[in-house]
Every structure is written in C-alpha cells, then in structure tokens.
Amino acid sequence: MIAALPRLHAVTDDRVVGAGAVVERAAAMAAAAGPALAVHLRTRALEGGALLDLARRVKDAVAPHGTWLVVNDRADVARAAGAAAVVSGRGGLAVRDLRRVAPGIAVARSVHDADSARAAEAEGADFLVAGAVFETPSHPGAGSGGPELVRAAAAGGRQVVAIGGMTPALAGAIIEAGAWGVAAIRALWDAADPAAAARAFLAALPATRTTPLVVNGESRAVPEGTTLAGLLEQLGLDRRAVVVEHNRRIVRRDALDGVPLAAGDAVELIHFVGGG
C-alpha cells in the first residue's frame, strides 16, 4: 500500500523551473499544507545531475512538513533523491520498468482518456494523473476532458489526481466527479503568496467520496460506503468462489454484506476451484 496520497499537487514545468525560487516556493507551500501536499518536479530543462540536485534541495525543504516529493519520468532521480513517487508521462517507461529502477516508491501514470486509464490500471500503477481536465496554457490546443475524463479515469478504482487549468473554484466539481485530488501549475507557482494559494485549494476541496484501500497488494479506491460484498460485485467476482480476508481476518460469506470498508483497509481475495 502506498502512504496516504496527498490531495493537492504542485507541479512544475520548464517555465517554473527556469524562473528559479522553486525550493523557496515549495517550502512555503509545504509549511502551509503539510502532508496534504505533493511537490512534483516535471521538467525537461535540467539534465540528470542538475535535476537530482534540485530534487534533493526540494526534498530537504518539504520533508520536515510531511510533504511528498514526486519526480516525473526520471525514476533514477526519484530513487536517488528519496522521492515518495515517480510519474511516467505519455510514452514513458512502463510501470514494471519504473519499479525495477526505483523499488519501494509509488508509481503513477499520466492518462488522457479511458483507454490510457485502463492500460495504466492493467500495468499496476498506484495512482493516475488525469488531464488535461480544463484548458491550460501549458498544453495549448490539446483540448480538455472535463469531469467526464475524471469519471472515466476513476472507474477502475485507482485514485485519480486531476490536472489542467485547475483553480480552487473548479476543484469541487472535480472531486464530485471522482477525483481524489487536484494538481496545478500556474495557480500555485505563479501566486504572489504560494502558501495562501495552497491553503485556498485545500479549503475548496470537499471531503472525498471515495475510500482508499489495498486489494491483493494494489491500491484502489471504492465509493464511500462500499461493503466487502459490494467490492466483490464491482470486481465481477462470485462470493461462492472467493475466500475474503479483511485486515488479516477471514470473513464468512454470509457476513460480507455487513462489513463496510474503511480508509486503509487491506483486503485479500483468494480464488479457489472446487472439484469432485
């Protein structure tokens, strides 16, 4: 299971990195948002050594507040810097290859439609970064998927972070559509007061309507109020052919309807084949 995924993600781009003050602004946001924040280093402007140096300085600045460091695409840098996660973009390394380079950290995939979301789930990505949800200057002319993209990405049960044109005013509708959290570039990094901007985003996020849990070692999110029986139904499994272990305790079939799932629960589903 990955550690509790932050709900607010501050993502850099080449412009933000080129402007400087990434460490200082990241530190200010981390002081305001703590473990609810992840700082993503996403840039093609820095070579490996320079990116690693920046990643380590950001990690030193945000870690005391419980904030995540996330590195995009460069699993080697993520591992060396002690990042909490690595995100593979369009055309990037497969999840299994990222895990080979950076074992023990969360692996996410950028997705842009229902097909890429399903592919990322099949690969075993821990969470998805879905976008662009709204029109954004960082990807002009790329279009936007809106809440429908979020719903499609969340349909498979992975936690979804929505990115693209995000503002505090838009965040609520995206969470209602099924996102776990939101990511922003300009609304955070370009703010006159990054700490205040981070607080504004967090204040705008309604309580999530999904429950994060682990099923057979993989992170998933299910609708709030789901029971063990409901989980089996969502997965298309017949309770008569599955042994269900909930937080290391076997649950009888006739009790599955009465066991609600809570955040952080661990579920093991063991298929068996009868014979005669």
Q: Language model features by range: what are they?
A:
Residues 139-144, 148-151:
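Substrate-recognition "cap/lid" segment bordering the active-site pocket of phosphatases
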Residues 137-141, 161-164, 218-221:
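Short, glycine/charged-rich beta-strand-loop motifs at protein surfaces that mediate ligand recognition
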Residues 88, 130, 184:
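Short beta-strand and adjacent tight-turn residues that come in two discontinuous sequence segments
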Residues 1-95, 100-126, 142-145, 157-160, ...:
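Conserved N-terminal beta1-alpha1 strand-loop-helix module at the mouth
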